[in-house]
């Protein structure tokens, strides 16, 4: 699961970088990482299924259940990273560009999610409940939820004032949704094993 954590983090980072500056090298890297992430997901899930079939003490059974969910969260972060890559490709192929305000919002949101993901992975790796870090993670997720709502509203205003096209609007709103979901999965990961 440690390797999946590293791959999911790297894939998310690279997908964000690709969205803002598309290039074929990054695309190949993300594609390769996604294949490894998919493979690890299948292998680890298969192993966990075998373990869960054994008669385990309650605490071990709880840990296996938590790992099932965590592996799924890593996989989903990879899926959202793939969606972000596709958004970047849509922008590039359609020769679309986002307004300066929209780009600023995207960069702010991306940075917030990356910080939250790093905090969450730290908590996951240490497997120690750190009350201060847990509070920071919860606050970060709440701020991301507030930003998502605020950015959606400001984008709808831009659409109604014809300051951006419907195509740009779809890319922005999809990307915003993917970022919010990555934050949700990161929060799940942070707290997954904290009570074990």
Predicted ranges, named:
Residues 1-196:
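Cytosolic, long alpha-helical scaffolding segments
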């Amino acid at each position: 699961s440690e390797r999946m954590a590293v791959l999911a983090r790297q894939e998310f980072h690279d997908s964000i970088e690709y969205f803002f500056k598309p290039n074929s090298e990054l695309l190949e890297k993300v594609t390769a990482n996604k294949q490894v992430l998919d493979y690890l997901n299948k292998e680890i899930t298969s192993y966990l299924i075998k373990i869960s079939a054994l008669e385990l003490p309650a605490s071990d059974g709880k840990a296996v259940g938590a790992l099932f969910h965590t592996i799924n969260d890593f996989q989903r972060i990879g899926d959202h990273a793939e969606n972000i890559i596709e958004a970047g490709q849509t922008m590039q192929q359609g020769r679309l560009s986002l307004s300066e305000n929209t780009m600023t919002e995207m960069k702010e949101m991306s940075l917030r999610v990356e910080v939250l993901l790093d905090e969450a992975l730290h908590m996951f790796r240490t497997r120690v409940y750190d009350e201060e870090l847990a509070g920071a993670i919860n606050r970060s997720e709440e701020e991301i939820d507030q930003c998502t709502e605020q950015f959606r509203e400001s984008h709808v205003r831009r659409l109604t004032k014809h300051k951006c096209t419907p195509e740009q609007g779809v890319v922005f709103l999809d990307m915003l949704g993917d970022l919010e979901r990555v934050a949700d999965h990161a929060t799940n990961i942070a707290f997954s094993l904290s009570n074990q």
